[in-house]
């Protein structure tokens, strides 16, 4: 079969998987999301020391009835974002050469990353960190964006063969994140919610940019701190050595 046709079919399968999961999540109950809520809750119990019990059509309630892990805590949007980032990156990097097995492999990796990000997000919420200059809703949104985009960026760096992280390369996970968290809700008419949506829009737009900028600054600082200047004698030896080698080569010719 023509490689371009295979590539197009792979792109179509990836897109349909993401859309199908997005639609499923939009109507799913906590009972239907136990495949991701249950392992997430188990990890939260391990790392937080709290215990939770499942309540049908509600979610996992803590034993002291102060915290609920409900459907919005499932992290399916992060799962979709991670899956799209991994698969689209593979399709772009190995254009017309990618094998079909990368799709289920990306799904498994994205699921594992989602469990880690979800567990971290919920444990942060359980820690009752107080950010005085934000109200409760703003802090919840702030923590969510920082944790989820931070883990998405980390996943990109780890799976992208740990190449040099340039600003142009980091635009890829940023663009995927914006597409899922901003473009899709906007096209679905979420902007009709008014001020609440635009506040959410501002957080999701600005915080990832600050994270990327902070990462690049830290990377530059690290490289500058580990740049060891060569002694003058070494530089001279290399210079004269290379010129000597060149002269010998010319004589040999």
Language-model segment annotations:
Residues 1-253:
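Hydrophobic N-terminal alpha-helices or hydrophobic patches in metabolic proteins across all domains
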